[in-house]
Amino acid sequence: MLVYNQEELVRFVEEAKQYARYGKVADYIPALGKANPNELSIAIYTPDDEVVSAGDVTVKVTLQSISKIIALALVLIDRGEDEVFHKVGMEPTDYPFHSIAKLEEKPAKPLNPMINAGALVVTSMIQGGSVSERLERLLAFVRRLAGNERISYSDEVARSEFETAFLNRSLCYFLKQHRIIDEDVEELMELYTKQCAIEMTCIDLARIGLVLALDGRDPHSSEPLMPLDVARICKTFMVTCGMYNSSGEFAIKVGIPAKSGVSGGILAAVPGRCGIGVFGPALDDKGNSLTGVKLLERLSKTYSLSIF
């Protein structure tokens, strides 16, 4: 088993922090705009239950778009591939994650579940009789994956996003017009913004990454937390679409299945080897953590983590 050196990891974090001045926090969401752009932390979770970390890994980060991969896993378990991919595609895009442009082409279904339009469709498919019931089902799934029953969501961030989610509302109405979703838009927005506001530490993120790295199995008990096929689909989307419209560049430079969020979080899964959680709020122009990507690039090269 490869041993990760903590002193080396601390040095990598300090090196990557130097790039923070070139990034910017997601201030278009008021609650996220309060983040310290110079913050950077990482946790690596290995199959033998070892955690190596650097930076302040007690800081909680909201999942934002990282939640898309978890919601997709839950919906695939509930409804199966055929039903899910009847409503959302599988292809990557070079358009920004919030773009409506490709929806205007035939068919009108979103290109993939990692862009906002596709994620809204996936969230609309979470089973339950009310927003609170559906959110609780998702939270229960997240808690099992992370091995942490205390995980919840940030009401402040959820409220901030709900009040400013005008573009996502427009995506919902477009999707409703084309009969891809059929529920009340405000209820869907409430569920989606609370989903994005689920918060956890880098260690929790790394534990979820490890579950994916182990093909959906619990690292302690080997119990399947999701079917192997679902874990495989999730990791495939993480490679092709997980880093927005710079996923190709990330695959070449880092080569690890990963999903980012505009909070500055990154969830990564190195098949069979480890899960990684990163938090660095300074974003690049694509919405990915600038310092986090630099850190993962250094880590991948040092420990030969690329899957390619």
Swiss-Prot record:
It catalyses: L-glutamine + H2O = L-glutamate + NH4(+). It comes from the Bacteria. Its EC number is 3.5.1.2. GO terms for molecular function: glutaminase activity. Keywords: Hydrolase. GO terms for biological process: glutamate biosynthetic process; glutamine catabolic process. The keyword Hydrolase applies. Disulfide bonds: none annotated. Substrate binds at S65, N116, E161, N168, Y192, Y244, V262. SUPFAM superfamilies: beta-lactamase/transpeptidase-like (SSF56601). Belongs to the glutaminase family. Homotetramer. This is Glutaminase. It comes from Geobacillus kaustophilus (strain HTA426). The gene is glsA.
